[in-house]
Amino acid sequence: MSIPGFGGDENPVEDLSETNATTFHLEGKSEWRFEVPFKTILSLKVTEGVGEIFGTELPLNVPVQLTGVKYALYAPLPEGCTVEYSTRINRDQAPGSSDSTDISEYISEDTPMNQYINLHMALESYRQETADYNYLNPSSPRSGPRVLILGNRSAGKTALARILSSYAYKMDHHPVLVNLNPRDGVFSLPGSLTATPISDTFDLESANGYGGTTTSGSAVHNPKQPVVKNFGFLSPTDNLELYKYQVSKLGVVVMSRLEEDADVRNSGVIIDTPALNIKDINVIENIVSDFEVNVVVVVDNERLLIDLRKKFKHKISNSQLAMVKIPKSGGVVELDDSFIRQCQEETIKEYFNGDRKTPLSPFKTEVDVKDFRYFKGVLSSDFNPSLSFLPSGDSYTTDDMDEDRKKDENSMDKFYTALEDPDASKLENLIIAITQLPQNNKQPKDLLNTCVLGYIHVSRVDEARGKMKVLSPMVAAIPRNILLVTTIGYTE
């Protein structure tokens, strides 16, 4: 018997449905690419040599349990590595699904890892130069590389961000990993924007491959402490103004951390983004400005690189900005909406319930609906109905709006709306962010500047009794009464 959060048997009795182990040798500089459905658990271990997944080295002779992933195991050394794996049915998944339980896998010698490693070495050289300069000039320190990764959807941007972060950590650096894609929950839940100093290896066995945080309890790996800004939607276009504002505020926090922490300052920043193209140049310009980006990496998009070089030619000519294009990995696969949604659900489930190694006991309780103040993000199409008629695929920029239709910058109307009469239709089965605002806060503008303390899930609202049943990751009263209702649905 194990106590949640205090270790225990991480290798329970094997499932009788587990397949016989398969062993093979992966040649050096090659990748073993595999896809594991959610209904299957892949038990993988490297028995000889060195193997890594997105820069995270697998421990020798220690099984790693993976489910619902599309990963690639890379052998960085010429001698390659020996891999052993087996599969079994994932009993945690709902039975009766028609989804396949078979894994898909193949080996490829055509990999862009050499280019990725060269990029890492260039960034490492930048960090060393920065550290040397700051040692000699402590009164006027410089910052390490602030890297912005851009590209189309399914270009491998997130994989590259993880590789660069992992390699930097191996060199004893602690870069800030910034996630600006609200679709992904990076050390947080979907619908958030986060910035996290990388102080340990990523936990590949977690639902999203990053690991746990102190907001959800103890963890096997060193828990990360992200700064979390609530966006509340899954796509930046749902409210572009709110997205840009939150990105800007996150940039302020990150740059402040760089000023105060010499180690993080020398290590720099790595920024992962949603799919952006030249139509989103206003968003890109804001990110470059907010995070003082000095390195832009474009993944497999020559046209975007050319357009950006024209747009930022003054910065490039003044050596304030460097741009580089790198190829897309042949192992990148298109993620369908159902797979993305299931990844999000697993991330939410793990936030409250933990994983196989570290199960958690979330707290279920009833609270009075009237004890809290509720705010919800405004959809751009609701604030400006003309946006509903945009052609599919077109980007929205506020520069095209008439001046008389722009709202005052201090207005909250285009960002949040207060839920004056919260009921089941507005709260039930939704994820709600707990803000860090004090109980008696009366300034609506502070909603934009606050960070997220944690999340709760509303499973049921009893309107007759004025009660709601909530799921919380901790056994305690909800510490704040100002809540942000997201559009992220979840059913236990």
UniProtKB/Swiss-Prot annotation:
Coiled-coil positions: none
One GO biological process term: mRNA 3'-end processing
Domain of life according to the entry: Eukaryota
Major location category of this protein: nucleus
Compartments (UniProt record): Nucleus
GO molecular function: ATP binding; polynucleotide 5'-hydroxyl-kinase activity
Any one Gene Ontology cellular component term annotated for this protein: mRNA cleavage factor complex
Keyword annotations from UniProtKB, A to Z: ATP-binding, mRNA processing, Nucleotide-binding, Nucleus
Cited InterPro entries: Clp1, Clp1/Grc3, Clp1_C, Clp1_C_sf, Clp1_N, Clp1_N_sf, CLP1_P, P-loop_NTPase
Residues where ATP binds: E31, K70, S154, A155, G156, K157, T158, A159
Family membership noted in the UniProt record: Belongs to the Clp1 family. Clp1 subfamily.
Quaternary context: Component of a pre-mRNA cleavage factor complex. Interacts directly with PCF11.
Function: Required for endonucleolytic cleavage during polyadenylation-dependent pre-mRNA 3'-end formation.
PANTHER family tied to this protein: CLEAVAGE/POLYADENYLATION FACTOR IA SUBUNIT CLP1P, POLYRIBONUCLEOTIDE 5'-HYDROXYL-KINASE CLP1
Protein name (database record): mRNA cleavage and polyadenylation factor CLP1
Organism of provenance: Meyerozyma guilliermondii (strain ATCC 6260 / CBS 566 / DSM 6381 / JCM 1539 / NBRC 10279 / NRRL Y-324) (Yeast)
Lineage: Eukaryota, Fungi, Dikarya, Ascomycota, Saccharomycotina
